[in-house]
Amino acid sequence: MSRFFIGLFVFLLTGNGFAQQLATARDTITVIENGKTLKMPWANGINYSNASNLDVNYDGIKDLVLYDRVNHINTGRFRCFIKTGPAGSTTYSFAPELSYYFPTVYNWGVFYDYNCDGREDLFCSTNSGIKVFRNEGTPANPVHFVLFKTILMSDYNPGATPFMGNIYASPVGVPGITDVDNDGDLDILGFSSQGVFIEYHQNMSKELYNTCDSLVFEYRDYCWGKFSESSCGISLNQCSPAPPAVFNSTNIDGKTYHNGACLTCLDSDGDGDKDLILGDISCNHVQYAYNIGTASAALIGDSTMMYPNFPAKNNTTRIQLNIFPCAYYVDVDGDNKKDLIATPSAFGSENYKSVWYYNNSSNTSTVNFQFVKNNFLQEEMIEVGQNAFPLIMDENADGKPDLLLGTYGFYTGNTLVSRLTLYRNIGSLSQPVFSLITQDYAALSAQGLFHLIPSAGDIDNDGDIDLVMGNSTGQIHWLENTAGAGNPCNFTVFKNNPFGFTTSSAEAAPQLYDIDLDGKLDLLIGMKNGRIAYYRNTGTAATPGYSLITNTFGNVNVQGNPSIYGIDGYAVPYFFNDGAGTKLLVGSISGTIFYYDVPANIAQNFVLVNPSVNNYNEGAQSAPFFVDVNNDGKRDLFLGNAGGGLSFFSSASPFVSLQEVDGTTLDQKVSIYPNPTSGQLNVQINALEFESVCLQVFDMSGRALNQVKSDANEFSVDVRELPAGLYMLKLQIKNKATQREVYKKVLKTE
């Protein structure tokens, strides 16, 4: 399989029979920061991640997969970064098309090879425990995981009548998954029922079956290493006397669980036993626990050798993040020596410099971690901290669209500070190039606001573009442009809540848009509850004034699944006119984008056309901006998310799709099988009259490879000569009146 896919995004705007589909590479717009061209600018940002090695594209080189979680939401997204440079380098490319196919995971997810087949499997959080997905990927189908264990169990009474209970794992933090006893299978270390001791669950796969392909655990030690951890400190020589060997359901259910910890297991001195790096939810540093015992009888005998400045060896920088730092023992530079990545695991910590990379410079079996950078991977992407809210406007009046980003906040000095970040277009109308100008546009950080979401429009009728911004409290602020018509923006006047209202739900996401067509810009405000408030401009063209019409405009509601997201929705609206009427995209807490048709009578309910127009969710708290940025007459999509980064999807694509007016999709009437295929594809068109069909095969960059024409409802296509990989089929189905098109992905295997 190719090392490098070009990302594909399917974006359907369906109304009056028409749907537009966007497909593009992520890097079709160049982004420059401080004179450096970013390698993966549209990689969505990173906040609080679990890091693992995984050969995602089956080229024999271990890549990096991050499971990135954002703020208070327990759902995250996998981000795949493909190792592209030689051994010893840290060059990676973003592979969004591979990121889409992982199982849905909550709280945390890490990869370890439990069955010794060379493919890392997925260990992840489930209710009070650990769930496991087996990796069954192949070069032709690289990201394919099958549920293996719904929850890992252990025998808490080994050697006698079995007493089975789940291995507890907090949803906050990550257990230690490693071969403790050096027998070739994976064991588990995790904080015990007392919350301060570490339990050891031994995997008996080797002992029972002489193979490592099972996960059969026995409870071996209630106090592995004979130490306790509490209040950001380690106490030695603990755990005496031992508790009863047999637990009953009462004291299992009554466990006082640890609030949250990350356990990183490694043999730091090459003596054959496991040492620990511990991260704690109440601490701003990690703790190092040195094992002076053996693999069979662990004894933590020194926690001061490098603590509290771990890994401050040879004057390197200590791991210190504001809240809950966790360490991950992974090979970053491909030299077959594991390095260290540290990231926070809780909201309220570093968010735009939150991936700390320590290179293992040791040439022996010991480790020597040397600090390299605190923004690994993030330095190559647009990264504005917590959340990104895109706005396209001509900031310097040169006729080219620039990019302005709002954010919930940059982590600075133990607090979050909201700012606006400006990328100016130094390219051309047809080929934008965004260059970072400032991360504190108009010095808005001085206002001490949170969750700044900008919208642009001339609300005082003086010929220049003003900014309004919503914030976390539900108020709207006005940044007045005093430059005058045709001049670069000059925002010198900040007006704090000049319109004198606060929305009924917090986190105001405003858009200036003349929804009632009276020539004045109204305020349409998305809110935390998933609704949109309509404030009509009842002032004059030169002196705006806003009156609340409704807090449930169009009856729009983008609340997520309450069992996951509670009562929140985080609506971020984008109204636009496509020539046939007003349409609405709404970003949401779940990351999906809702698409509505707005009736001419705006007092009526809007028509929900599609509750998930982006087939591939880019991350929680999506924020769409849909505008023609490359002057080709077609709208392009900028999509912000809670990770503090952006995705970009261009309209410049050969892929266009139609949908029938009656709601039955053409896609549903076309079958392609078998899929995957190793040689022949069969095409079947059902319940549809047509004169001819033309089928084209494209690779994922949009390059046409093959073409077949037919007038039959069933025909075949020979694809034996194509290399293994992912392809797109485009079917043009014609009759006398119309030509309609449909797209299908197919997987070619060897």
Model-identified regions with their sequence ranges:
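Initiator methionine at the very start of the polypeptide chain
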Residues: 1, 19-20
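Positively charged n-region of N-terminal signal peptides that target proteins for export
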Residues: 1-4, 748
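A generic structural signal for short, non-catalytic loop/turn and secondary-structure boundary residues
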Residues: 3, 335, 398, 665-666
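Compositionally biased regions
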Residues: 3, 171, 429, 506, ...
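Sec-dependent N-terminal signal peptides
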Residues: 4-13
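C-terminal outer-membrane/trafficking sorting elements
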Residues: 11, 19, 662-673, 677-750
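Beta-propeller-forming repeat regions
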Residues: 20-658
